[in-house]
């Protein structure tokens, strides 16, 4: 019997490397891990594909989904709306697949109220200077937008202590190894092992 999948909430200020870490984690398309594809009203960035990176919808469509109680969580960030499909998450977890939510602290608080057992991971940059360097290096945003993101980052990072784990993304490979360690450790909990190896445990303890 396979254990129910774990729900991982991964949050970070923009530029901390959250999306890159999740992409690296799933690059080999593991069958037991899946990132949740959120709905958003923001415009696609260069290279982003609808249905793969996000489900891009209009504000009217998004509000209709909220009215239908279709979202596990939703939040407004920088004037854009983001939401996670409730049914998709539940169905995926029931198959024993770990799901990763790439969401901010507001969304994390909503998820924790519904599913307290969700595991929170917060990614931090090694310094403000490095965070600004990464944002500038993207070449996607104006100086005004970067300044706004830096100001927002301080607010976001103040919520790090609401999470179960914290990773400092100074060295990318080490940060990725840390993330993998967190994931695999959750599969070795007593509850997970009981579900996965129930028959074996019953046999071992039989008279």
UniProtKB/Swiss-Prot annotation:
Origin, by domain of life?
A: Bacteria
Cellular localisation: Cytoplasm
Predominant location category: cytoplasm
Q: What GO CC terms are in its UniProt record?
A: cytosol
- A Pfam family (short name) is Guanylate_kin
> What would be an example GO MF term here?
guanylate kinase activity
Keyword field: ATP-binding, Cytoplasm, Kinase, Nucleotide-binding, Transferase
Q: Which EC numbers characterise this protein's activity in its record?
A: 2.7.4.8
- Reaction(s) this enzyme catalyzes, per UniProt: GMP + ATP = GDP + ADP
Give residues annotated as binding ATP. 12-19
Concerning SUPFAM superfamilies, the annotation shows: P-loop containing nucleoside triphosphate hydrolases
Outline the extent of the Guanylate kinase-like domain: 5-184
Q: Does the record's keyword annotation contain Nuclease?
A: no
**InterPro entries per the record?**
GK/Ca_channel_bsu (IPR008145), Guanylate_kin-like_dom (IPR008144), Guanylate_kinase (IPR017665), Guanylate_kinase_CS (IPR020590), P-loop_NTPase (IPR027417)
- NCBIfam families xref list: guanyl_kin
Q: Which PANTHER family match?
A: GUANYLATE KINASE (PTHR23117:SF13), GUANYLATE KINASE-RELATED (PTHR23117)
Q: What does this protein do?
A: Essential for recycling GMP and indirectly, cGMP.
The family note in this entry says: Belongs to the guanylate kinase family.
Q: What is this protein called?
A: Guanylate kinase
């Amino acid at each position: 019997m396979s254990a129910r999948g774990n729900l991982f909430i991964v949050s970070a200020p923009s530029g901390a490397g959250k999306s890159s870490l999740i992409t690296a984690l799933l690059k080999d398309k593991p069958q037991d891990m899946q990132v949740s594809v959120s709905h958003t009203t923001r415009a696609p960035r260069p290279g982003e594909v609808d249905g793969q990176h996000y489900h891009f919808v209009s504000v009217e469509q998004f509000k209709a989904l909220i009215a239908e109680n279709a979202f596990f969580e939703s939040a407004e960030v920088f004037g854009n709306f983001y939401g996670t499909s409730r049914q998709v998450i539940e169905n995926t977890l029931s198959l024993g697949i770990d799901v990763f939510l790439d969401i901010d602290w507001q969304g994390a608080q909503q998820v924790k109220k519904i599913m307290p057992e969700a595991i929170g991971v917060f990614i931090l940059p090694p310094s403000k200077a490095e965070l600004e360097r990464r944002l500038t290096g993207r070449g996607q945003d104006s100086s005004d937008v970067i300044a706004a993101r830096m100001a927002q980052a301080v607010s976001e990072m103040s919520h790090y202590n609401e999470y179960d784990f914290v990773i400092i993304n100074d060295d990318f490979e080490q940060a990725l190894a840390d993330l993998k360690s967190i994931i695999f450790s959750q599969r070795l909990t007593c509850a997970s092992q009981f579900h996965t190896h129930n028959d074996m445990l019953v046999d071992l303890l039989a008279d």
